[in-house]
Structures are given as structure tokens and as C-alpha cells.
Amino acid sequence: GLDDVLTSIRSAENPSPKKRGRKRKEAPAKDFKAVLWASADKLRAQMDAAEYKHLVLGLIFLKYISDTFVEQQQKVLATVSNPESDYYLGDDPADHQEALEDRDYYTQENVFWVPADARWESLRNQAKQPDIGQLIDRALVAIENENPTLRGKLDKRFGAARLEPGRMGELVDLISTI
């Protein structure tokens, strides 16, 4: 269950500092662990570990691919805005926006295409909606439809999760801190 995931995270950490170079930052891993534990605590009383691990890990995956997509967007914008680049498009913001929605810039870098309504920021902005579970499920379906390698692989049980009202939104807000 989730305890196994956390154990593997703990075992992957390197407790000894490097002898040369910059000291390794450990805060992000601790933050990640803290968020995982807080997520588990939010759900533990309402469902068993076998179910809540799918919700938590599914949201983490959704946030990860969305964050990766946004990072690639920033790279694309920097490239098409740079007069020194072979891909320079001039100063017209409309041309830049069009480039940001060109899926080739993402797929050539092995970044999953994430439709606008499925992006984490869009979901986070709707986290307090009573139907956030269904919105997440629809986002996962949209991602599967746009990325053939993911078809049928994403767990879409958010709309059917039996949680207290507002709990799924709290979970989205919590995962947003990672």
C-alpha cells in the first residue's frame, strides 16, 4: 500500500552527504513525504489503503505530467521568443501562443500532451467544486485520448470515491504543494 511507497522513498534517500561539491538538498523530499502522509491522513478514516493509494498516486501522476508540460511550455516560449533561435517567431504574442499549443514541441521531447482543461492549474482552480472528482476523471480521459500510450492505463475512480464533501478538493490543494 502507501506504506510500501513511503518505505521505498525512505530507502532511496542517501543519508550520507557528498564529500565534494554542493551539499545535497533534502527539503523537497521531506516536503514530498510530508504531503504523502498528510494525504493519507485525510483519506485514512474514509477508505482502506488499497483505495486511497490509487487516489493519491493518481493525483501525483496528474500533477507531475502537468508540471512537466508547463516546464516544456516555458522552454518553447523561450525558444520562439529568442531572436538567436532557429525557431524564432518574432514579437507577435499570437504567434507565441500558437506555438505553445503545437503538440510537436512536446512530443519531440517525450512530454505527454495535456489538454488545457486537464492541466493541474485548471483542476486546482476548480478544487472546491462539488464535482471535482468527475472533473479529474474527465481530465484523465482527455489525457488518455491525446496520448495513445496511456490509453486504458489511468485509474479513473475519482468521481466514484466515497469521500466527505470537500475532501477531494482538500486533497487536490494538498497535492498542489508538492
Locate the predicted segments by residue:
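Non-catalytic, mostly N-terminal accessory regions of nucleic-acid modification and defense proteins
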Residues: 1-178
